């Protein structure tokens, strides 16, 4: 029963994520500001923006490789498949990469579109994801996998989340 519910949930997640991406891309296109003349700043914005988008694709692909479908689709919310947490690949570089650096794509598109509205929406979406991490994901991980997850790793994650919030805020204010 739980497995069937999880499979149905995966379909819903894919639909929501797909429509979320499509809506965000349409929003970006609607707010894109083409430069009047192409200069060095424009080149830098495009190169950094495309680099952030490519980094995001790599980060999410590597996270899926490490996690697999079970963890990618929050399988342990539905049924317990006793496994230890895996800290490999991107997880060795960034704690919770889906929440900390997983929004590089949004910021990259914000730079490419040269739109303050896109940057602000990207920032707000990122902050909502970090709130989900703090209030849903982390308590769930501690409940399922125990307090061995706590300690140094949690302190590092808290610092990274705070730095991610500060970096996002800085990008939003500066742009």
Model-derived segments and their meaning:
Residues 1-91, 100-175:
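Membrane-anchoring alpha-helices and their flanking helix-loop junctions
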């Amino acid at each position: 029963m739980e497995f069937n519910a999880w499979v149905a949930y995966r379909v819903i997640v894919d639909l929501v994520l797909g429509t979320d991406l499509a809506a965000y891309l349409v929003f970006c296109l609607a707010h894109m500001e083409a430069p009047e003349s192409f200069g060095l700043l424009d080149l830098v914005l495009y190169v950094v923006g495309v680099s952030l988008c490519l980094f995001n694709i790599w980060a999410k692909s590597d996270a899926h490789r490490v996690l697999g479908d079970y963890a990618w689709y929050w399988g342990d919310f539905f049924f317990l498949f006793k496994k230890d947490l895996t800290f490999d690949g991107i997880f060795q570089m960034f704690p919770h990469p889906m929440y900390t650096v997983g929004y590089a794509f949004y910021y990259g598109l914000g730079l490419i579109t040269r739109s303050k509205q896109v940057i602000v929406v990207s920032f707000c979406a990122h902050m909502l994801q970090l709130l989900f991490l703090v209030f849903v994901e982390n308590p769930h991980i501690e409940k399922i996998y125990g307090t061995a997850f706590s300690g140094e790793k949690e302190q590092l994650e808290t610092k990274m989340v705070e730095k991610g919030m500060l970096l996002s805020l800085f990008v939003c204010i500066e742009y």
